[in-house]
Swiss-Prot record:
It catalyses: Na(+)(in) + 2 H(+)(out) = Na(+)(out) + 2 H(+)(in). Gene3D superfamilies: Na+/H+ antiporter like domain (1.20.1530.10). GO terms for biological process: regulation of pH. The chain crosses the membrane at residues 13-33, 58-78, 93-113, 124-144, 153-173, 176-196, 208-228, 260-280, 291-311, 327-347, 361-381. The gene is nhaA2. This is Na(+)/H(+) antiporter NhaA 2. It is a multi-pass membrane protein. It comes from Campylobacter fetus subsp. fetus (strain 82-40). One of its GO terms (molecular function) is sodium:proton antiporter activity.
C-alpha cells in the first residue's frame, strides 16, 4: 500500500501554519490589537451586484464560504479514495471505519454525561467527536520513519471517515429553518451537475458556475452551506473520454490553498479566545469539561477500544508492521480536534459567550495536550520498538 505523500506534505506543513495562526489569534485578542482584531471579524463584506448580493461579516464569509471550499476538497478526496484508493475495498476500510465510529460515540457520551441537564449546552455534543487531519498528520510526520506507513494510512483513512461523519452530523443536527424555494434551486443545480458529469464535461468553469449557485441556494435553504461543497465534489468526473482526471486536477490545485490558506485563516478568526478575567471555575464548567475529556479521553479510548474488539473478534488485523503500543499512540492523536471542533462549536453555539469561552478553551487545551502526549508517547515507544527489533536481529 502507498500513502499519498503529496497530501501528507500539504497537511503536515499546514499543521505548522495552523499553530502560527492560533498563536497570532490569541495574541491579537489578548494584546493591544484586541479592538483591531474584533473589528476585522465584524467587518461587513458585500459580494454581488444590484439586488443580487450577499452581505456578511468576515467571520461568516470564512466559516460559510472558505470552509465550503475545504469541504469540497474533502469531498473530492472521499470520491477518489472510494473509487480507487484506501476506501475502495471493504478490507481496507473496515478497521478505520470501526475506529472512527468509536471516536464519535464515546466523546459524545462523555459530553452528554457532563451536560445532559442543560438544553442549550447539550447542543455541543458533536464538538469533541471531530479530528483535525492537518494537526494529527503533522504530529505523526514529525516522527518520520519511526512510524510504519500503514499507521499513517490508518490515521489518514480514519480522518477521512471522521470528516464524513462530521458532514452527516452538520446536515442532520445543525440545520435551521428550511426554505422550499432554495431547495428547488439547489435541486436544479444538482441535476445540472449530474448532466455535466454524465457527459463527462471537463471544463472547470462550468462546474464552478453551477457550484456557486448551489452554494448560495444551500446557504439560503437553512442547511449549512459547507454541505454544498461536499455534494458538488461527488459530481466531479473521475476521468473524461481522453483519460484526463478533472477530479485529481482540482484536488491537486486546491490542496495547497486549503492547507496553507483556508484552514490557517479559519483558525485565526475562530481561535481568538479572550483570556481576560478567566477564572478556574469558568474553565471547569460542564461544557469545557465535556469538550476537554471528550476529546482527550473519549477519542483515544473510543477509537482504540472499538478497534481492539474488532481485531480480537477476527474481523481485521493491526496495520502492517505496527505494534499495539504504536497503534494506541496514533489513537491519542485523534484527540486533536482543533479546527474541526472549532467549526462545529461555531454551529452549535453561534459564537455565544454563554460559557465564558470555556468551549473554545476546552478545544484548544485538549487538542494541545493530545498532540504533546501523543508525540512523546510515540517517540518513546517507537524507539523501544526499534531497539527491540535490532536486538532480535542480532
Amino acid at each position: 500500500m502507498k500513502i499519498n505523500l503529496n497530501f501528507v506534505k500539504h497537511e503536515s506543513f499546514g499543521g505548522v501554519l495552523l499553530i502560527i495562526a492560533t498563536i497570532l489569534a490569541l495574541l491579537f485578542q489578548n494584546g493591544f490589537l484586541n479592538h483591531f482584531y474584533t473589528e476585522i471579524l465584524r467587518a461587513e463584506f458585500t459580494v454581488g451586484f444590484r439586488d443580487f448580493n450577499l452581505s456578511k461579516p468576515l467571520i461568516l464569509w470564512v466559516n460559510d464560504g472558505l470552509m465550503a471550499i475545504f469541504f469540497f476538497v474533502v469531498g473530492l478526496e472521499l470520491k477518489r479514495e472510494i473509487l480507487q484508493g484506501e476506501l475502495s475495498k471493504p478490507s481496507q476500510i473496515a478497521l478505520p471505519t470501526i475506529g472512527a465510529l468509536g471516536g464519535v460515540i464515546l466523546p459524545a457520551v462523555i459530553f452528554w454525561a457532563f451536560n445532559h441537564g442543560n438544553d442549550f449546552a447539550i447542543r455541543g455534543w458533536a464538538i469533541p467527536t471531530a479530528t483535525d487531519i492537518a494537526f494529527a498528520l503533522g504530529v505523526l510526520m514529525l516522527l518520520g520513519k519511526r512510524i510504519p506507513s500503514s499507521l499513517k494510512i490508518f490515521l489518514l483513512t480514519l480522518a477521512i471517515i471522521d470528516d464524513l461523519c462530521a458532514i452527516v452530523i452538520i446536515a442532520i443536527f445543525y440545520t435551521t429553518k428550511l426554505s422550499f424555494i432554495s431547495f428547488v434551486i439547489a435541486g436544479i443545480c444538482l441535476f445540472a451537475l449530474w448532466v455535466l458529469n454524465k457527459f463527462k464535461v471537463s471544463k472547470k468553469s462550468a462546474y464552478i458556475l453551477v457550484t456557486l449557485i448551489l452554494w448560495v441556494s444551500v446557504l439560503k435553504s437553512g442547511v449549512h452551506a459547507t454541505i454544498a461543497g461536499v455534494v458538488a465534489a461527488f459530481f466531479i468526473p473521475m476521468r473524461d473520454d481522453s483519460g484526463k482526471s478533472l477530479l485529481v486536477e482540482l484536488e491537486h490545485d486546491l490542496q495547497g490553498i486549503t492547507s496553507y490558506f483556508i484552514l490557517p485563516v479559519f483558525a485565526f478568526v475562530n481561535a481568538g479566545v479572550s483570556l481576560a478575567g478567566v477564572q478556574i471555575n469558568q474553565l471547569l464548567n460542564s461544557v469545557g469539561m465535556g469538550i476537554f475529556f471528550g476529546l482527550l479521553i473519549g477519542k483515544q479510548v473510543g477509537v482504540f477500544l472499538f478497534s481492539y474488539i474488532f481485531i480480537k473478534l477476527g474481523f481485521a488485523k493491526l496495520p502492517e508492521g505496527s505494534s499495539w503500543t504504536q497503534f494506541y499512540g496514533v489513537c491519542i492523536l485523534t484527540g486533536i480536534g482543533f479546527t474541526m471542533s472549532l467549526f462545529v462549536n461555531s454551529l452549535a453555539y453561534h459564537d455565544s459567550n454563554e460559557f465564558f469561552h470555556a468551549d473554545k478553551l476546552g478545544i484548544l487545551l485538549a487538542s494541545f495536550t493530545a498532540g504533546v502526549i501523543g508525540y512523546i508517547y510515540l517517540l518513546v515507544f517507537s524507539k523501544v520498538a526499534k531497539n527491540h527489533r535490532k536486538d532480535n536481529e542480532s
